[in-house]
Amino acid sequence: IMDLWVREARLFKYGSGTGTNFSNLRGGSEGLSGGGKSSGLMSFLKIGDRAAGAIKSGGTTRRAAKMVVVDIDHPDVEEFIKWKVTEEQKVAALVTGSKLCAKHLKQVMSACHNCEADGESCFDPSKNPALKREIISARKSEVPENYIQRVIHFAKQGYKSIEFETYDTDWDSEAYLTVSGQNSNNSIRVTDDFINAVIEDKDWDLINRTNGEVNKTIRAKELWDEVGYAAWACADPGIQFHTTVNDWHTCPASGEIKASNPCSEYMFLDNTACNLASLNLMTFMDENKSLEID
């Protein structure tokens, strides 16, 4: 698995992208041959995501192009579906939390210095009503107690202000760089059997990768609703229709098509390349600026 990140890094370095179906990796609840439980699909996807985020594609400012595909019957597919939703909620928490902390800590500091009491009394909430009020307000906003006390101690030492970095929701901001799942297009691979199970409101089995046994059974509609909500909330995962793709396969005897390139317009066999070409249509125009297409 780790060798894949090395090979991907080389491809990203020279301006190319990758698409990989990770469904052969065992789920987090599956056992290991040496005992214990697997760390699961998501732990490895997060390593690959971090590696991709560190590389500029082709030496430019563009991030690496990466498609991650997981089959709809994988034991960890629910966690995969919710991956970006959860991470973007972390961004929202970072943005809101950082601004609330900065606001309340500034007010605590101000209450320490703008008080009518003398000396140490300014830093004692039982003797400084303004400080008590700001501490209560900060606690109501869930500002960590250690930060509140830190500001009071700083104020005692004569500091008039405290630095507390805030974050924003710009896609290239520090908040987004902090969370995972931001360096790939994520897609689930669905079959006609799954779609029919959704239509007929049947159960759907998630299958262990090691022994082929049923890991968990859920309603297909519930899983489909999770996909719909995640796509609405964060635009991922995309959907690749495995049965349809392979029905249209031009070389079916050579094996299944399991994934696509990062933009998903090219689907073919494992370990094949998507070599794109372009034409300058201006060279096909005549003197009347009409295209000669015959």
Model-based region annotation:
Residues 25-26, 34-47, 60-64, 69-237, ...:
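Conserved, charged catalytic cores of large soluble enzymes
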